[in-house]
Structures are given as C-alpha cells and as structure tokens.
C-alpha cells in the first residue's frame, strides 16, 4: 500500500514534539474512562491537556475525528503498518485511548507486522485489558496501565504501569525541554513503572 493511501484510510499520524518519532492520536472526548475522570478533581484527566492549546484548532479537531472514524476501516491494520513500519519507536494515543477489544487486537496486528518498531500504548481502559493475557501481547509492544488518581496506587494485576505524582517523578522530560531526548523508559519492559510529574 502506498503511503498516500494509508494516510487517507487512517487519517495520518500525529507528531507530538515531545516524542522521538510519530504517534497516533484520537479525540480525548472519545476516552471512555478518561471522559468520566475529566470531571473529577485529583485525577490526571482533570483539566486534560488534550482539550487545550493546539487540540482546539479546527484542523486538529477534524484530523482527530477522521482517525476515530477510521478505526473500523477494513484496511486499517494494513494502512497503519505502512505508516509505522520504518519507525524505531511509536507511541499509541498521545491523546485518546483504546475504543474496544477489537481496536486493541488490531493494534496487536500492527505491532506484529512491524517487528523492528518498539510500540508503547498507555491506557486507562482496564476493562479491555482484563480480556487480554499479557503473554499474548506482541514482544515489541508495552501496554502501561495508568493510575486513575494523582499520587494514587498503581495497579498490581498488570505488569507495566504509569502514574502521575506531585511528589516524585522518573520521567526526565520536564528537566530537558519537555522532550524524551535519549530516554526510552516508557518503551522498556524492564521498567515496571514510569512516574510523570503532575502538569
């Protein structure tokens, strides 16, 4: 499949400045768990960044909606494979989240089709992960279950987590211009938890 056709089908990739390479984002309003948490003070989703700044530009909103609509396209897996296959690192959902078990399984297929790419998928959709045995996750994909509360406890039933804290952090981005630079902890399965500072 040609790149132009892949972009037409999927809505194209996003390019968050913090990340080392591309990402794929969806509208934050479509987050199933996050949409509820956004109304609750003390959660990382409260006053969500994906409802501010450039995310409010009409062209960005349109692109997010195109990507959301593309998820059920019969060639979505093939198209995403075309766009991702030459990247060394890829982040799923710098905004938005998993929409269904089928969506998650399709992400698995993209990961299997791009074995040279390391994939990172942060999520708050624990209800979908409960259908998944961690042992069937592609070796080049790490799914980090993110805690629901700032300074809260991490899930113990899932092997990789991320959290937001007002007290500590392991993510160095804040100290280096809000960029990953050479850090790849989020993609590293040996790193069981990554803690981000509260925005």
Residue ranges of predicted features:
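Class I S-adenosyl-L-methionine
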Residues: 1-199
């Amino acid at each position: 499949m040609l790149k132009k056709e892949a972009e037409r089908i999927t809505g194209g990739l996003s390019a968050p400045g913090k990340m080392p390479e591309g990402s794929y984002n969806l509208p934050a309003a479509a987050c199933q768990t996050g949409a509820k948490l956004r109304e609750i003070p003390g959660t990382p989703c409260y006053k969500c960044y994906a409802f501010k700044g450039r995310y409010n530009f009409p062209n960005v909103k349109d692109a997010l909606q195109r990507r959301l609509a593309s998820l059920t396209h019969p060639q979505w897996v093939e198209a995403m494979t075309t766009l991702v296959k030459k990247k060394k690192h890829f982040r799923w959902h710098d905004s938005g989240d998993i929409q269904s078990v089928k969506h998650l399984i399709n992400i698995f297929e993209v990961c299997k089709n791009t074995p040279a790419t390391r994939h990172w998928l942060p999520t708050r959709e624990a209800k979908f992960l409960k259908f998944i045995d961690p042992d069937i996750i592609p070796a080049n994909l790490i799914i980090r279950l993110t805690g629901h509360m700032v300074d809260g406890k991490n899930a113990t039933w899932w092997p990789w987590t991320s959290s937001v804290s007002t007290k500590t952090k392991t993510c160095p981005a804040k100290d280096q211009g809000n960029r990953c630079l050479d850090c790849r902890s989020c993609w590293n399965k040996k790193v069981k938890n990554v803690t981000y500072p509260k925005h």
